[in-house]
Amino acid sequence: MTVGAVPRGHYRFRHAARMEWIKLRTLRSVKWALLVALAGMIGIGIAAGHNTINARGDVTNNILAGGALGSLVFAVLGVLVMTSEYSSGTIRATLAAIPRRPLVLAVKTAVFGVVALVTGEAATFAGFLAGAAFVRTGIPHPALSQPTVLRAVGLSGAFLCLVGLIGLALGAIVRHGAAALAAVVVLVFVAPLAGLAQTPAGKFLPLLIYANSLGATQPVSGFTLSPWAGLGIIACYAAVLLAAAGWLLSSRDALTG
C-alpha cells in the first residue's frame, strides 16, 4: 500500500489515516503481540473451561479469564503505538506533515481503535469457543446463542480495545514507553491488588469491572455495576485520558515540552 502524494502540512483525515495504518502494520511488535494475546486467551480459555467443576458457577466468566492477559497485551500495544514515534524521533516528521496536532491523536485513536476492537473481539470469541469446547460433561456448556453469554463475550472484546486506548493516551501523556507502561499496569493491574479492591472505590477499577461485570453472566455478590454501566466507566477513563493527551500534545513541544 502506498500513500498518494499530499502537500506537506496538508494531510486530511483520510490521508493521515492511511499513513497511520501503514505505520501500524509495519510495526513487527504489533503482529507478535496480537499472536501472544490470541494464543494466551485460547490457552487460558481451554484450561479454565476444562478445570471448571462447579456446575452452578459462571462458566463463561471462568473461560474469559484470559482477558486479563489480553488487556495487558493491548495496553502495551497502545503505549507502543504512541511512544515508538517519540523514541525514534519521527514524531517531529509526523507533526510537520500534520500541523493540526489534535488530528494526529484523532487519527491514531481511530486507526488503532478499529484494529484493537476487531482483533480484541476475534481473540475473545476464539478464546471463548475454544474454552467452551473443553468444558467437562455434567457442567453447563455456555453457548453464544444465550444472550448473557454473547453480551459477556462481546463486552470483553470491547474492554480490550478500551484498555488499549488507555495505553495509547498514557503514551501520549508520558511520552516514554517504560513510564507509560508502568502507569497503565498500575491503573489496570496493581491497584486491584493493593487493597483497593476491598474499598468503595474497588468497583470502579478496570480489571475488577471486567471480572465482575463485563465478563460475567450472573450477578456477583457485592458488585452493583451492570455490564453496560461498567463498559461506560471504562470508556470514560479512555475519553478523559485521550482528552488530556490531546491538550498536552497541542500545548507542548514535540519532544522536550
Task: Cite the ranges covered by each PLM segment.
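Hydrophobic alpha-helical transmembrane segments of polytopic membrane proteins
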Residues: 73-79, 149-174, 232-245
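Terminal transmembrane helical anchor/hairpin motif
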Residues: 2-11, 33-37, 42-61, 144, ...
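Residue-level signature of transmembrane alpha-helical entry/exit and packing/kink sites
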Residues: 15, 29, 33, 65-68, ...
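Membrane-interfacial helix-loop-helix connectors in multipass membrane proteins
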Residues: 129-153
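Selective transmembrane-helix segments that form parts of the transport pathway or gating/packing helices
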Residues: 102-130
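Long, hydrophobic alpha-helical segments
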Residues: 64-85
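Aromatic- and glycine-rich beta-strand/loop motifs that create alpha-glucan
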Residues: 1-34, 175
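Transmembrane helix boundary and interhelical loop/hinge segments in multi-pass membrane proteins
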Residues: 56-59, 78-97, 101-102, 109
